[in-house]
A protein has these predicted regions:
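Domain-edge interaction signal
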Residues: 1-157
């Protein structure tokens, strides 16, 4: 079992939604947000041996997704999610720095590119086992499989 942070997936989502430089033309769609959150969780598990947030990702047809995040932002479809105005961010400086690094690394890509990347990675592939291509799948991508995979990624760098 992993040690817990008090952060929720919505705290992390709000951080990413606020960090987007919309004036410079940057955008964040629901698809991109899902993948950025997935990578944040994966790398956090690998670096710190604890979860960034407790919520899980499922192995959906378009890559890792969290159903609560999907339900909150699905109304935006393929459009960019606007900056939240009423959400305050109460995240430690260390976690802010970590999330900023994740954004610097993955925020330059669009959601479709990130989706394609996750489709090549073991945690999603393993969780999709038994599900047909395009089939709705609610199999959990385990934090253990994410940690193991992302540890190999950081060790290869």
């Amino acid at each position: 079992m992993f040690r817990k942070n008090s952060l929720s997936i919505f705290d992390a989502a709000n951080f990413f939604l606020k960090i987007v430089d919309r004036d410079a033309g940057s955008t964040i769609t629901p698809l991109k947000l899902q993948k950025i959150l997935y990578y944040a969780q994966g790398y956090y598990l690998a670096y710190y041996d604890k979860e960034l947030f407790s919520e899980d990702f499922e192995a959906w047809a378009h890559g890792p997704a969290n159903e609560a995040i999907y339900n909150k932002y699905k109304k935006y479809g393929f459009d960019s999610i606007p900056c939240p105005t009423d959400e305050t961010i109460n995240i430690s400086d260390n976690i802010c720095a970590f999330l900023s690094d994740i954004w610097q690394t993955f925020g330059i890509y669009d959601g479709k590119f990130l989706e394609e990347q996750t489709h090549k990675e073991e945690p999603w592939i393993k969780a999709r086992k038994g599900c047909a291509i395009g089939e709705r799948c609610h199999n959990i991508i385990t934090k253990e499989s994410m940690k193991d995979f992302f540890k190999t990624v950081i060790n290869d760098v």
